[in-house]
Curated annotation (Swiss-Prot):
Pfam families: STAS, Sulfate_transp
Topology of this chain in the membrane: Multi-pass membrane protein
Family (UniProt): Belongs to the SLC26A/SulP transporter (TC 2.A.53) family.
Catalysis performed (reactions): 2 hydrogencarbonate(in) + chloride(out) = 2 hydrogencarbonate(out) + chloride(in)
Name the UniProt record assigns to this protein: Prestin
The species this protein was found in: Homo sapiens
Lineage, uppermost ranks: Eukaryota, Metazoa, Chordata, Craniata, Vertebrata
Pathological condition linked to this protein in its record: Deafness, autosomal recessive, 61: A form of non-syndromic sensorineural hearing loss. Sensorineural deafness results from damage to the neural receptors of the inner ear, the nerve pathways to the brain, or the area of the brain that receives sound information.
Intramembrane residue segments, as ranges: 242-253
Length: 744
């Protein structure tokens, strides 16, 4: 069989033939029978809600304590090795990040270790993701540090501070108190949102928004770390233009940089960059990524202790790491009114980052995460953790990739990582007291590489979507210069405005028919597509509501070229001209009405006398005109039907319904029918609820599809032509005749 025969057979088998009636809405409803649905009464719903069965109790436990579902099904032989390797790899990364992110949060380093321990244990019981790593995250830590520095600035005067050391300790204690308060409030917000099933709020933080926000946060983190890398003493700034002030402060003090601190930092920086490139290039051959950050911490601590860098070269180090866990403490709730804006921003950003990474890894491994339960889990981790003096946590992107990439199967890997942190807190913390802050600064800056790579989004969005590019840029700029809290608020407002813009300014298309098919496509896109004579098909790809209803009406007239007002005016002008030509001045005042009015024959133009004044009845303008009048007709005057394609309209509000009713009436006044094609059940309900079908005859305007509407229009016109061409009956010729009396 040659290719020509194959193509013939393929073409024959790819055709379909359907024979059915033209489905207007009434005809289709006659063929359908609605299923009887008996709605549950309120009493039945309450009874069902408060009914207690073993299965229901089990499902509730599974929902709020996911560990009770996956732990009994734990496949020990398959999972234990992967969880063990993953836990160790994540733990050695979590140690330096916990210390470094505490610097971002403007609290002593030990509190970064607390935040790497308590929340991880709680998330193991409460979280639905098996792979993400919970704990300190650079962006959230920076936001915590921003509010802590705003309320407790570097130059604050602490009453009772005898010397600089005591003053610094008192200042740090106040910042810890602020961090605990904002962490508690953000946790309460997350928990309440989860209980109220508001997990969907993450959808308002679109990917361009999140990526623009995290890129701006990366710039904030980078500028915050420069002072530690250069070893200079500068004031820490927060709020509007803080990134500018921080950069200027570092540059002004660059002449005072600590060469030893910079040298150690650059050495670690180069080691980490080269090592990460090695890990990436040979990741298929390595059983696990080399824990570069841990080696950097060990090496930096060893060099600092061996050469006594703190005393000999005045290098800033981590300092005291007290052993043991602190007893629970009550956060200061009196600060809530000062930090609620920051708490809301931290709660939303923390959840958005967490659910984004959780869904990515869940899709990769074939399971689902519950956004509402993730909110509850984060809320409890933060609110309960604040009692143990932790600061707000989230999902760490870099640690999550390590935990998943090294073979982690469940959150037992996270538990093992937290136990390693506990070992440092209880026994070995003093070993890291000589660690230079420049090493931690280099670790943080290197881990920002992935966020800085998001600048490559700009050419991508430039090619694909200017609106998403606008969201990215406005989010980045506002978050960079207004601060992360107000920047996020601005970004969300901009994102919502783009939604309004998209629906207010949708694309409008005039459709034509692909010959010998029932397919209707944009006539401006393809040469083969042709308009059907006398019919205009108009499509919108958005809902019709108060923000775009007038624009829709205007676009309909502009795109189709059929404007009822223009047609009416042209007809009046033509009639006046025609009246003058036939010498009948009174006809110039005649009224033009729709074509299907019930006026026929000579009586249609026969004058009547009333109170001595001669009046003419309305003149009927049909689809054909004398040649003398046709010269004055506008281009759209030969159109008899406008079909509105509603297949892409998902709702229409009361303002849209009024606009639609006005369109139907306006076109009807000049003898043009308006059909609605492809209305969804929701749109039909909206039209019914807003009394669009108050006149039952309007149901005849609804058609199941564009093709049904086209065929219905053509059938109507054919019947009208047949009726017009039929010879008049005897009764029409002799309207006053009386029927003959039959003979007896």
């Amino acid at each position: 069989m040659d290719h020509a025969e194959e193509n013939e057979i393929l073409a024959a088998t790819q055709r379909y033939y359907v024979e059915r009636p033209i489905f207007s809405h009434p005809v289709l409803q006659e063929r359908l029978h609605t299923k009887d649905k008996v709605p549950d009464s309120i009493a039945d719903k309450l009874k069902q809600a408060f009914t207690c069965t073993p299965k229901k109790i089990r499902n509730i436990i599974y929902m709020f304590l996911p560990i009770t579902k996956w732990l009994p099904a734990y496949k020990f032989k398959e999972y234990v090795l992967g969880d063990l390797v993953s836990g160790i790899s994540t733990g050695v990364l979590q140690l330096p990040q916990g210390l470094a992110f505490a610097m971002l949060a403007a609290v002593p380093p030990i509190f970064g270790l607390y935040s790497s321990f308590y929340p991880v244990i709680m998330y193991c019981f409460l979280g639905t993701s098996r792979h993400i790593s919970i704990g300190p995250f650079a962006v959230i830590s920076l936001m915590i540090g921003g509010v802590a520095v705003r309320l407790v600035p570097d130059d604050i005067v602490i009453p009772g501070g005898v010397n600089a050391t005591n003053g610094t300790e008192a200042r740090d204690a106040l910042r810890v108190k602020v961090a605990m308060s904002v962490t508690l409030l953000s946790g309460i917000i997350q928990f309440c949102l989860g209980v109220c099933r508001f997990g969907f709020v993450a959808i308002y933080l679109t990917e361009p928004l999140v990526r623009g926000f995290t890129t701006a946060a990366a710039v904030h983190v980078f500028t915050s770390m420069l002072k530690y890398l250069f070893g200079v003493k500068t004031k820490r700034y927060s709020g509007i233009f803080s990134v500018v002030y921080s950069t200027v402060a570092v540059l002004q003090n660059v002449k005072n940089l600590n060469v030893c601190s910079l040298g150690v930092g650059l050495m670690v920086f180069g080691l980490l960059l080269g090592g990460k490139e090695f890990n990436e290039r040979f990741k298929e051959k390595l059983p696990a990524p080399i824990p570069l950050e841990f080696f950097a911490v060990v090496m930096g601590t060893g060099i600092s202790a061996g050469f006594n860098l703190k005393e000999s070269y005045n290098v800033d180090v981590v300092g005291t790491l007290p052993l043991g866990l602190l007893p629970p403490a009550n956060p200061d709730t009196s600060l809530f009114h000062l930090v609620y804006v920051d708490a809301i921003a931290i709660a939303i950003v923390g959840f958005s980052v967490t659910i984004s990474m959780a869904k990515t890894l869940a899709n990769k491994h074939g399971y689902q995460v519950d956004g509402n339960q993730e909110l509850i889990a984060l809320g409890l981790c933060n609110s309960i953790g604040s009692l143990f003096q932790t600061f707000s946590i989230s999902c760490s992107l870099s640690r999550s990739l390590v935990q998943e990439g090294t073979g982690g199967k469940t959150q037992l890997a996270g538990c093992l990582a937290s136990l390693m942190i506990l070992l440092v807190i209880l026994a070995t913390g003093f070993l890291f007291e000589s660690l230079p802050q420049a090493v931690l600064s280099a670790i943080v800056i290197v881990n920002l590489k992935g966020m800085f790579m998001q600048f490559s989004d700009l050419p991508f969005f430039w090619r694909t979507s200017k609106i998403e590019l606008t969201i990215w840029l406005t989010t980045f700029v506002s978050s960079l210069f207004l601060g992360l809290d107000y920047g996020l608020i601005t970004a969300v407002i901009i994102a919502l405005l783009t939604v309004i813009y998209r629906t207010q300014s949708p694309s409008y298309k005039v459709l034509g028919k692909l010959p010998e098919t029932d397919v209707y496509i944009d006539i401006d896109a393809y040469e083969e597509v042709k308009e059907i004579p006398g019919i205009k098909i108009f499509q919108i790809n958005a809902p019709i509501y108060y923000a775009n209803s007038d624009l829709y009406s205007n676009a309909l007239k502009r795109k189709t070229g059929v404007n009822p007002a223009v047609i009416m005016g042209a007809r009046r002008k033509a009639m006046r001209k025609y009246a003058k030509e036939v010498g009948n001045a009174n006809m110039a005042n005649a009224t033009v009405v729709k074509a299907d009015a019930e006026v026929d024959g000579e009586d249609a133009t026969k004058p009547e006398e009333e109170d001595g004044e001669v009046k003419y009845p309305p003149i009927v303008i049909k689809s054909t005109f004398p040649e003398e009048m046709q010269r004055f007709m506008p281009p759209g005057d030969n159109v008899h039907t406008v079909i509105l394609d509603f297949t892409q309209v998902n709702f229409i509000d009361s303002v849209g319904v009024k606009t639609l009713a006005g369109i139907v009436k306006e076109y009807g006044d000049v003898g043009i029918y308006v059909y609605l094609a492809g209305c969804s059940a929701q749109v039909v309900n909206d039209l019914t609820r807003n009394r669009f079908f108050e006149n039952p005859a309007l149901w005849e305007l609804l058609f199941h599809s564009i093709h049904d509407a086209v065929l219905g229009s053509q059938l109507r016109e054919a019947l009208a032509e047949q009726e017009a061409s039929a010879p008049p009956s005897q009764e029409d010729l002799e309207p006053n005749a009386t029927p003959a009396t039959p003979e007896a």
